[in-house]
Every structure is written in structure tokens, then in C-alpha cells.
């Protein structure tokens, strides 16, 4: 009951009306001051930082250029199927005599199924025209088709298929380049964040140490404390100031190191704007979860380096089909339907076709096929080599992911211990401060406890930084830093 009465006596009395008005003014001014300081500081979040890199960084642009070049190569490969218009003119005159006068115009279309369609007109006259040519005007429509080698695939179709594959492969190469770039940028970003957080942490403790020094100076002037106590307090201020200056230097150098990732649209680098600060909140929200098995599964399906080799395998599969076709003899059919007076074709009944056509058949076959067999064997060896590389790379990636998982588990345990140490050192400091008020301790012990507490805070920050770096290295190893 006595405690309750004493507690009620400590209840603050209502402020006079004038004091209330002054207090409102102070609060309004304080809010304005805080809002101005907050607006002066610009928080650079990690996602925004990476977006800046993806837009203007030279490596990001180089990666996009590779994609654009592959797209241009694919577009050029389509050119083998462009219709081709040709014209040939040959004329010979001597002593006023026309020996021959040839004018041939032809339109030829290569199709993706291996069939070549053509149509043209010929005009031939002269005293010594070739017997193979039809005197006068001639129109024709014809087809050319391979029946063995080149029926399923030929060089032009293989190039087109491989160009489409290389275009997709360039996208994986871009992801791989950005994955490596993002890792370096993320590591430097969190280093900057940790340094800034250390600086913020130490400035708070520096303020506490200065307040303690001011109180001891007043107590010394009143004769309640000795000169040695003020000297102890001043030494503690100096100690924390040294730590703060070191953290400030690290924060500034870390901020400068981020400039190597910051480029504008004019390909000019720039430094962070004054007042830009990192996302300290995100640094404090360290996610403690084991994603090792999930990331291994993702890496096997989505890792850009493995994707590059898989597309190489697809391109080699096209090459294998082409080389297998080279083992077959060359056999081509040619057929033209003819008509005098250009395109004055009659109805396509049997007598007309039997009497107005031109037919050809080409056949060629090397007797030993050594070149074709050697090329085919080389392609099979390339496929075997690429399969071995994929298996080895997959195992390397899996081991990297697991090793970073082991590292994170160890850091997790250390973080838990560190959090407990912070609480314990804080309690020891509070107990020592209470004992000092009772005259049972010294300022030297207070400083010692405070130094240990600060040391535990900085150690905790260091462990958080190591954990974040390890977590993002694991994402990098899985190839999923870039979506």
C-alpha cells in the first residue's frame, strides 16, 4: 500500500495552459525538423540499385548487345530462303550478223522443306544459237528436289535452326553475365549497409558516453566525483570516437566503391548523391532459412551456365542430323513445265505434259565416304564431350550450393550465440550501472562492460554481413540472382 501511495505521488501534475501551448509549438517544430532531415536522406534499396545496374552498366549493355547480335544473325540466316531474282543477258554480233542473243530472267524460291520452286522466261535468237535452247520466247515453271542427301535437312536449314538456338543461348549468356555482375554489386551494397549501420550504432553510444562525461563534469565541479572519474569518462568518449571514425571511413569508402556500378544513359559513371543512405531495415531483417535442396533443384533446371551448354547440345544435335545426311548419295530431281510464248500454258492434260517438259536427274556418291564419316564421328565426339561438361558443371554447382548452405548453418548458430551475448552484456552493463549508483562499482568497470557490449553489437553486425553475403553467394551459385 505504501508503494502504491508513493507511486501515485509520482504521477505528473497537469501542465498549465501556457505550458501546454508552448509544448505544442515545440512538438510542431520538432516534427518539421525531423521531416526535413528525413526528406534530405534518400534510401537506396537493393532492388533499385540492381535496376540501375541492369539499365546502364557497361557489362549489362554488352550482355544485351550479344543478344541483339544473335537476333541479327538469326535474321540473316533467314535470308537463305529469300526469293532470288536473276537475269542473264548474252549477245554476240560480228560483221553485222547476230550470232546469238540470249535473255533469261528467273525467280527462284528456296522453301524450308528442301523444295526449290522456280519460274522464268527465256528469249533466244541468232544464227548460231545453241541447240539446247528454244528459239523465240519460252516460259517455264519448275521444281528441284533432293531425294536422298538433303531431303530431311541441308546446310541452309541447319544454319537457320542453329541460329534460332544460338539466339536462345545468348539469353542464357546474358543471364550468366548479369548473375556474376549482380553478385559483386550485392556484396558491395551490403558492405556499405553494414558500415553505415556500424556508424549509426556507434554514434548512439558516443552520445551516451558524452552525456555521461557531462554529468561527471558537473559532479566533479560540485565535489561529488574525482578528476580520475572524469578522465575515465573522457577516455571512453575517445575510444568510441575512434571506433566511430573507423566506421565512418569504411562507410565512405564503401559508398565510393558503389560508383563502379553506377552509370547514366550517356555511358558516364557517377557517384551516389549526397544524403543517400542504404536500406538499414532490410539489413536487420535477415531471413534464417535453409533453401539448399530447393536451390539445387532450381539450379539443375534454370542455371544459365547449364542452359548455355544445353543449347550447345541442341545445336550439335542439328549438326549430327546434317552430318548423317552427308553419308547419303547426292540425288536431285529437276522438272520444268515449258510453254512457248512465255506463260501461254495450255490445260495440264497428259499429252501436253508429255510433250512440253524438261527433266533432269543428278547423282553423285563418293566411293569411300571418308570425309562424311570423319565429320560425323567428330560431331559424335563433340556431343560426348559436351555431355561430360554438363555432368561436371552440374556437380560443381551442386557442391557450391551445399558448401554455402553449410556456411550459413554455422553462421546461423553464431548469430544466435551473438544475440544472446548482446543481451547478457547489456544486462551486465545495467547491473554495473546500478552498482555504481550504490557506490559498489567504478567507472572503469562501467567502461569495460560498455566496451564489451559495443564489441558484441559490432560482432553481431559482422556476422549478419557474413550471413547475407553467404546467402547471396548461394543464390549466385544456383544462378537465380537474375530472373
Predicted regions and their residues:
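Terminal intrinsically disordered/low-complexity segments used for targeting and assembly
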Residues: 1-3, 14-57, 61-64, 68, ...
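Periplasmic alpha-helical coiled-coil/stalk elements that build and connect Gram-negative outer-membrane
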Residues: 165, 171-295, 407, 452-453, ...
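Sec/SRP-type N-terminal targeting helices
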Residues: 61-65, 78, 114-136, 147-173, ...
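Bacterial Sec-pathway N-terminal export signals of envelope proteins
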Residues: 40-98, 148, 152-158, 162-164, ...
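Membrane-embedded alpha-helical bundles of multi-pass transporters/translocases
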Residues: 76, 81, 87-88, 108-111, ...
Amino acid at each position: 500500500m505504501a508503494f502504491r501511495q508513493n507511486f501515485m505521488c509520482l504521477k505528473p501534475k497537469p501542465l498549465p495552459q501556457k505550458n501546454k501551448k508552448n509544448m505544442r509549438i515545440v512538438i510542431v517544430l520538432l516534427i518539421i525538423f525531423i521531416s526535413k532531415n528525413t526528406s534530405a536522406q534518400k534510401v537506396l534499396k537493393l532492388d533499385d540499385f540492381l535496376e540501375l545496374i541492369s539499365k546502364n552498366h557497361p557489362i549489362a549493355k554488352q550482355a544485351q548487345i550479344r543478344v541483339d547480335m544473335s537476333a541479327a544473325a538469326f535474321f540473316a540466316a533467314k535470308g537463305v530462303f529469300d526469293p532470288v531474282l536473276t537475269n542473264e543477258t548474252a549477245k554476240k554480233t560480228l560483221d553485222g550478223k547476230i550470232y546469238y542473243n540470249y535473255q533469261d530472267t528467273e525467280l527462284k524460291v528456296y522453301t524450308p522443306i528442301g523444295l526449290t520452286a522456280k519460274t522464268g522466261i527465256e528469249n533466244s535468237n541468232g544464227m548460231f544459237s545453241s541447240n539446247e535452247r528454244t528459239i523465240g520466247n519460252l516460259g517455264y515453271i519448275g521444281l528441284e528436289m533432293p531425294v536422298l542427301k538433303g531431303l530431311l535437312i541441308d546446310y541452309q536449314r541447319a544454319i537457320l535452326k542453329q541460329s534460332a538456338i544460338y539466339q536462345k543461348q545468348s539469353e542464357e549468356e546474358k543471364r550468366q553475365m548479369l548473375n556474376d555482375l549482380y553478385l559483386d554489386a550485392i556484396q558491395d551494397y551490403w558492405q556499405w549497409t553494414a558500415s553505415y549501420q556500424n556508424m549509426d550504432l556507434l554514434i548512439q553510444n558516443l552520445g551516451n558516453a558524452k552525456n555521461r562525461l557531462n554529468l561527471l563534469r558537473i559532479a566533479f565541479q560540485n565535489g561529488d566525483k574525482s578528476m580520475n572519474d572524469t578522465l575515465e569518462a573522457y577516455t571512453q568518449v575517445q575510444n568510441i570516437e575512434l571506433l566511430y571514425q573507423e566506421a565512418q571511413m569504411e562507410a565512405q569508402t564503401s559508398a565510393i566503391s558503389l560508383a563502379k556500378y553506377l552509370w547514366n544513359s550517356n555511358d558516364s559513371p557517377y557517384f551516389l548523391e549526397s544524403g543517400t543512405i542504404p536500406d538499414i531495415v532490410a539489413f536487420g531483417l535477415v531471413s534464417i532459412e535453409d533453401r539448399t535442396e530447393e536451390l539445387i533443384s532450381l539450379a539443375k533446371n534454370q542455371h544459365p551456365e547449364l542452359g548455355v551448354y544445353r543449347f550447345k547440345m541442341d545445336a550439335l544435335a542439328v549438326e549430327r542430323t546434317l552430318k548423317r545426311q552427308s553419308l547419303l548419295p547426292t540425288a536431285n530431281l529437276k522438272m520444268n513445265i515449258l510453254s512457248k510464248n512465255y506463260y501461254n500454258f495450255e490445260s495440264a492434260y497428259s499429252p501436253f505434259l508429255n510433250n512440253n517438259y524438261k527433266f533432269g536427274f543428278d547423282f553423285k556418291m563418293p566411293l569411300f565416304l571418308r570425309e562424311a564419316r570423319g565429320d560425323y564421328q567428330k560431331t559424335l565426339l563433340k556431343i560426348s564431350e559436351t555431355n561430360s561438361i554438363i555432368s561436371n558443371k552440374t556437380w560443381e554447382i551442386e557442391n557450391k550450393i551445399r558448401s554455402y548452405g553449410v556456411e550459413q548453418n554455422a553462421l546461423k548458430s553464431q548469430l544466435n550465440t551473438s544475440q544472446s551475448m548482446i543481451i547478457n552484456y547489456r544486462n551486465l552493463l545495467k547491473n554495473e550501472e546500478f552498482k555504481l549508483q550504490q557506490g559498489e562499482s567504478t567507472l572503469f568497470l562501467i567502461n569495460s562492460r560498455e566496451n564489451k557490449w559495443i564489441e558484441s553489437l559490432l560482432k553481431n553486425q559482422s556476422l549478419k554481413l557474413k550471413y547475407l553475403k553467404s546467402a547471396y553467394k548461394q543464390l549466385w551459385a544456383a544462378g537465380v540472382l537474375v530472373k
